[in-house]
Amino acid sequence: MKAIVLAGDKQYLTPILTTIKSILYYNQQVKIYILHQNIPSDWFHEVKIQVERLGSLVEDIFIGDVIDLEWKTQGHISPIAYARYLIPRLITEDRVVYLDSDIIVHGDLSPLFELDLGDYSLAAVRDADGN
């Protein structure tokens, strides 16, 4: 299965669900890890049922208070955005793709999993606004 990681909080449930739906529209056999501090377990239960019907999985990765909610961020960005830095410690997959939780996927993500990284352990792209 392709491993995809998202991070979010309970105020971001609609964008997370939208991102999941767009991933699954174009991709099958996906394992989606969601890093969080406060997403209710009943939400995960419902999402897992829906995603499993499509042949994919959702994993609830509670990170506790590892990230201080008072950490400095810019504007609308939540401190949970720092969770991406925990991926190597929390996810044991050979390769993962981290996606922001407020995006729409418009195609097959397989090329990202097949990309030759050479000796690098990480690849990244700039945001559309150039940051």
Regions found by a protein language model. Give the residues of each.
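Glycosyltransferase catalytic domains, chiefly GT-A lineage
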Residues: M1-N131
